[in-house]
């Protein structure tokens, strides 16, 4: 497998801090923000953004985790025996601005599934999307409001956002699977 590190741990820290500042700026006047990480790697990214926002502002940040496994339209193709990790959104989303956090925006199908799952929990005032990487190739009309890095890719290339809590390190890699 041919792999290239695009973002190292230090650069990833700066990228997440920049995203945190952007979220604060575009949520001007908000006393409370709701970050909901999409399982699996969106959750630790949301945790880091929450910590940054609370460190640099007086905005209260509510944090949740969303499992979209059962909302995917490709569930049967990808996961004959899906593992459900559970949703944990310990606050009412109704009337709130909710920022969904994910690692990679690709086809838009994960973001669509996350919106479906979130709307079942209530009626947010607005849903925004924050991703570490936007790699293009959309199949649905979805765009992120906050993007850490735009990485145009070929269809046979993949992006791996690695986070310490899941992968033991923080970095973003581009790779091509062996044929």
Name every feature range the model reports, one short phrase each.
Residues 1-179:
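PRPP-associated nucleotide enzymes
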């Amino acid at each position: 497998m041919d792999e290239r590190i695009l973002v190292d741990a230090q650069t990833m820290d700066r990228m997440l801090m920049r995203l945190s500042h952007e979220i604060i700026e575009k949520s001007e006047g908000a006393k409370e923000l709701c970050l909901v990480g999409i399982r699996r790697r969106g959750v630790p990214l949301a945790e880091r953004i929450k910590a940054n926002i609370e460190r640099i502002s007086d905005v209260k940040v509510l944090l949740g985790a969303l499992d979209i496994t059962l909302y995917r339209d490709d569930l049967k193709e990808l996961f004959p025996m899906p593992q459900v990790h559970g949703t944990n959104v310990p606050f009412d989303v109704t009337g709130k601005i909710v920022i969904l956090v994910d690692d990679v925006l690709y086809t838009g199908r994960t973001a669509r599934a996350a919106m479906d799952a979130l709307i079942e929990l209530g009626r947010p005032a607005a849903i925004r999307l924050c991703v570490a990487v936007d790699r293009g190739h959309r199949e649905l009309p979805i765009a992120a409001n906050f993007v850490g890095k735009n990485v145009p890719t070929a269809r046979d290339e993949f992006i791996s956002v690695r986070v310490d809590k899941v992968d033991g390190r923080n970095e973003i890699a581009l790779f091509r699977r062996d044929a």
